[in-house]
Amino acid sequence: MDLQDAINQRHSIRQFTDKPVEKKMITKIVELAQRAPSWVNSQPWQVYCAMGDTLQAIKNAYRDQDIAGNQGNSDLPVMSREDWASQTQDNMKQWRHGIVHHFANFDEAHEKMTNASNTLYDSPVILYITIPKASPDWSIFDAGLFAENIMLAATAYGLGTIPTYNSVRFPAILHQTLNVPDDERFIVGISLGYSADTTINSYHSERRPVNEILHFN
């Protein structure tokens, strides 16, 4: 698969099969992703791969937090969507509109999306990306470049992905379960696996026309 195909075919997968992903494949994906650029080649990222019993322990602990009514407290701050810029609010509104019309009605869309999110998409693997707490904001940008490389590489190898806030909203659980040092902070979790043939996975979000975001001077 060439780069253009990988970029166009990558989209968020919200339901995975139970087919396991081999460690050898995960290693290939992460090794390829390491070619991402970073400030002075700082390469601030670490990757913690949760699978099997470890991932199930995380899912169980998250479920317990949800039952207790805890909302989570991710290492990166979360801003109310009402405070986002108008253009980004419009984009999110269009995304929600597209999701609703992809299903029979709002109730079905809400149920499917909520269940998928609450179960961490039933993914067999989550790759947790961290950076040192002693990092500039630019390291978050670098981690994003690295994360995109992971998702493109996974697509090229026939796997699906979705990067989520939901996977990192209880960092204390992750530090304990994954044995992550306290001086690292969680940036994102990328669910990884083989895509299930379901309605929720056939949705592809739209993008703004390029002339609305590209400005020649």
Predicted features along the sequence, with ranges:
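Acidic, surface-exposed loops and disordered segments
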Residues: 1-217
